[in-house]
Amino acid sequence: MRLILIFFVVFIGFLSCSKSTNSSIVNNTTTPPPTTIAKQLVFTGSGFANNGNYPKVYTCDSSGFSPGLQWSNAPAGTTSYAITMHHFPPTYPTEDKHVYLVLYNIPSTVTSLTDNSKSIGAFGINTVDRKNSYTPPCSQGPGAKVYILTLYALNAAPTISVSSAQVTMDVLLSGMRNKILDSTVMTVTYTR
């Protein structure tokens, strides 16, 4: 009988500890803090977006003027933007990339460019006609060609130590080193 009584007391003690532990866990449970999702640059074009088709109007098969572009969600501290557009030919790396647009010193207050915009920012040179302007893609041969537009949010103006007639995409990228707060890529396709 004594053995049964000891067993009963131990059993009741075990249940009471177990119950107390469970309520303590429930009372001490906290809700994790909400997750903060960082803003990311959003970059689109007039009539096209990432992984879309590049409109004919912006190529040499039509008017060939520069595309309208829009962006939002710049990180804090952005003082200016830069935009490049290029593609890699099938013979890359034997043949260098083709650059169609090098545009920098776009004020942080600007969040869009209209079609054929020529008065905002500073143009570097393209590799097609070596002019300080946009030049339209003029894809050679059949099949889809992929073009890459990149938007850069900068915390300071690029360090450019050459004349504007010598600012290539590579010169600009070098001048933006350690000044890029964020960047985003828009890849588009054009088929002749």
What do the predicted segments below correspond to?
Residues 1-4, 18-19:
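Positively charged n-region of N-terminal signal peptides that target proteins for export
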Residues 18-192:
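N-terminus-centered regions that define maturation/targeting leaders and the start
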